[in-house]
Amino acid sequence: MRNTELIEWFRQSAPYVNMHRHKTFVIMLDGNAIAHPNFINITNDISLLHSLGIKLVIVFGARCQIENLLKQNNISSSYHHNIRVTDSNMLEIIKQAVGGLHYDIFSRLSLRLPHSPVLNVVSSNAILAQPLGVIDGVDYGLSGKIRRINIEAIQQQLAQNAIVVIGPIAPSVTGKMFNLAFEEIATQLAIKLKVDKLIAFCDRQGLLDEQGKVISDIHPREAKQHLKKFIQQGDYHHSAARFLQAAIDVCHAGIKRSHLISYQTDGSLLQELFSRDGVGTQLSEASSECIRLATSFDIAGLLNLIRPLEDQGLLVKRSREQLEMEISQYTIIERDGIVIACAALIHYPAEKMAEMACVAVHPDYRDSARGDILLEAIKRRAYKLNIEKLFVLTTQTIQWFQERGFVQIQPTDLPVEKQRHYNYQRMSKVLMLALDN
């Protein structure tokens, strides 16, 4: 990464550093993630999150390690509803696998980066289990489910600046150990702790669309359709499918956001949390992006967006004072607290006309539909004001507006007040759209 790229990334990440500080995240790591060569980088990134003041609970699974140990001991497994039926011999193998991974996680988190503080990593016995029992005539043996979680104990550990690590086995009230699905543990912990995020490291970089591109944001309702496809295609064993169910469940329970990212990609955790669009898939009941009327608090963001375009001569220069006086005219698209697009509606009531002015979209989003979204929002505002004609002045985007129904007119067709201020040196083209009220 060149110095300029590093500086730009660091500047863009600053709002997210403040946004995530003192928040609580549950991180899901399955056995494949822990066994992957990139795991050392994942633990370094987890340490970095902790140093930034983020409270972390790591919930890990051991499915692939358990399978390998069972094969080595010539023990076969049976499943019912994708849950392992566990007997006493298997449980000893499971405890061995889980104990080994516990040690691996602790040792990796103890490998500090140079000059970094010592991490306080603790194991929690806050989970109390009970047997699954008999379902559909199948006795699950020592496979269990959560009976109770001592949330207060975990909160105390987090308050003491500890990273809490929880594995997929837990005792019952009688002291008998049970094998639990770590997805259930992560889901219930996230819900009962009321965390800010659930982050799952999968075998793929989130969910993909029909073109094979990562879906950056998705509503849980749409995510359910992807889950159905996984099940129909027999792909439920993939971690992306199993973790997707957990992400959907916690979103429905009120957790603001869940993320699916790849454990195979170096830096995916940092890119997902500290950049506008991330690298994986974010699930949220409320989108991270919204379109709304601007307020005085948006002026700094507006200036950051339009200044480069003004310097290039694409927009007429506007002072901060002018923006402050005209802020009520602006509609913005905001993403994670950052203004990524804007447009103003300037009303000329005598002629029942209005100008769509200061149209700007951040370079990262110009290939998307943000311009169309802005235009539709401006048209809706215009309808409410009984505006009959919407016009724009442009030097570079003539074709874009023509493709959306605007036709070229003469400056003399503008409202009288606008004609007085028309800049004949700039020679902007004037385009008009008739609005059907």
UniProtKB/Swiss-Prot annotation:
SUPFAM superfamilies: Acyl-CoA N-acyltransferases (Nat) (SSF55729), Carbamate kinase-like (SSF53633)
Location(s) in or outside the cell: Cytoplasm
UniProt gene name: argA
Keywords: Acyltransferase, Amino-acid biosynthesis, Arginine biosynthesis, Cytoplasm, Transferase
Highest taxon of source: Bacteria
GO BP term (any one): L-arginine biosynthetic process
EC number: 2.3.1.1
Name assigned to this protein: Amino-acid acetyltransferase
Known pathway: Amino-acid biosynthesis; L-arginine biosynthesis; N(2)-acetyl-L-ornithine from L-glutamate: step 1/4
All residue ranges annotated as the N-acetyltransferase domain in the record: 289-437
Molecular function GO terms recorded: L-glutamate N-acetyltransferase activity
Miscellaneous note of the record: In bacteria which possess the bifunctional enzyme ornithine acetyltransferase/N-acetylglutamate synthase (ArgJ), ArgA fulfills an anaplerotic role.
